[in-house]
Design a protein with these regions (language model features):
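Intrinsically disordered, Ser/Thr-rich regulatory regions of eukaryotic membrane-trafficking proteins
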Residues: 1-219
Length: 219
């Protein structure tokens, strides 16, 4: 009898590093501005960041304007973004897989096509845009609060923001960064309409109104 098990795609790591820091041997950890998961050993963090920096530097020899954007392996996908000069953000996700057991024999098939580079790149860009919306650019924060201040804000923001990213549910619609309408029956839609009209009538200084429920658009 055959049985199967599906493992969904997951966020494995997310980090921000500055290539201008930690240039001396033994100070490489200073490059890291933020790293998730935080419980990784320092050696592993430094090794992963160093590998990414080496990949970027190597690919710059072929295309200086657009160096390494994504790395594919059988089990992982890694995407790169340079939102500001010399500051890189890297996200690594697992490739979903299906395990089948038939007559005691176990086979695992990784579904590469399920993970799209463009979708992950959009998610990475959005993560930076959201930080910039609330705090300003990395450079501005660093100029105002210093490197440790930047690290603290990155930690505070991304430790919460990354919890909202469901990698397995990212799809082509994520690229357009749109918003879904909340389906309502006529009665509930009319109540929402009346509520918005009441608010706008009561507070005359309101010029535009957006009514959200969760992450869906009502009005």
């Amino acid at each position: 009898m055959a049985t199967s098990y599906v493992k969904e795609s997951e966020l494995l790591s997310f980090f921000v590093y500055d290539t201008r820091l930690g240039l001396k041997e033994g100070t490489e950890e200073q490059k890291i501005l933020y790293y998730h998961p935080d419980n990784e050993s320092v050696n592993k963090k430094v090794r992963n960041v160093g590998l990414c920096e080496a990949l970027v530097n190597f690919t710059k020899t072929f295309n200086p304007d657009r160096p390494c954007q994504a790395v594919h392996t059988d089990r992982k996908r890694q995407v790169f973004l340079e939102p500001e000069p010399e500051i890189w953000t890297v996200m690594t996700v697992s490739i979903p897989w299906v395990e089948q057991v038939n007559n005691g024999e176990r086979t695992v098939q990784y579904i590469q096509d399920y993970v799209q580079d463009e979708v992950l790149e959009t998610a990475l860009q959005r993560s930076y845009s959201m930080f910039k919306l609330f705090h300003g650019s990395y450079t501005d924060v660093c100029n105002q609060a210093g490197q440790e201040g930047l690290r603290a804000r990155l930690q505070r923001f991304y430790s919460r923001y990354l919890q909202t990213i469901d990698v397995d549910k990212l799809d082509i619609f994520s690229i357009f960064q749109g918003m879904q309408f909340l389906p309502l029956d006529k009665y509930m839609y009319l109540k929402a309409h009346c509520f918005v009209n009441l608010v706008e009538t009561t507070y005359r200084n309101i010029q535009r109104t957006v009514f959200l429920y969760g992450d869906q658009l009502v009005w």
